[in-house]
Amino acid sequence: TGLYMTSRAGLWMDDQGCYWLDPASAGAQSWITSAVLELKNMGFHEVMLSNFRFPTSDAYIYTGDKTAALQNAMQNLLTSTASDSGTFTLSFGTNDPTLTLIDGARSRIYFEGIDAANVQTTADQSTVADKQAQIVFLATTNDTRFDSYSVLRPLTAAETIEAQKADTNN
């Protein structure tokens, strides 16, 4: 269920020692579904699958259409976790604005690693139905170009913003 090295000697591992799942694999999708449903049953209202993408390396083998594989995996995961009803939300962390959420799904796209200069372009390329509600940028800076959409920043960035507000009010 993983991505194989080009030599076919075994599973490919990234530079941080992590193996990547093959999103087209039924076994990988089943394992992810089980993990998501376990979290859902524990009472979590949202699960975000980070790094929902293929690695940027040419050291592994994948001969299929990567975007189609991700799109199909996304649809299967949304359907198998019943994210189209109730209050549970299954979301995806990616840097690919072309991934499309299925109609009626309770889901969001969390854009990872998007430069502030590309925020509007990324949002414009996205095909989600409700961009204000279904796009979330994971930002590491206080750049205001992210603020037209939902944005999550590290606590240190939020503390800096609050300190700047306090300085302005004094």
Predicted feature locations:
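Active-site-adjacent "subsite" loops/lids of carbohydrate-active enzymes
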Residues: 1-37
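Active-site-proximal loop/short-helix segments
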Residues: 4-7, 45-71
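Extracytoplasmic/secreted proteins, especially bacterial periplasmic and envelope-associated proteins
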Residues: 27-35, 43, 69-76
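Aromatic-lined carbohydrate-recognition surfaces of secreted/lumenal glycan-active proteins
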Residues: 48-50, 68-100, 136-138
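Substrate-binding cleft/loops of secretory-pathway carbohydrate-active enzymes
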Residues: 88-119
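Substrate-binding cleft of secreted/luminal carbohydrate-active enzymes
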Residues: 107-170
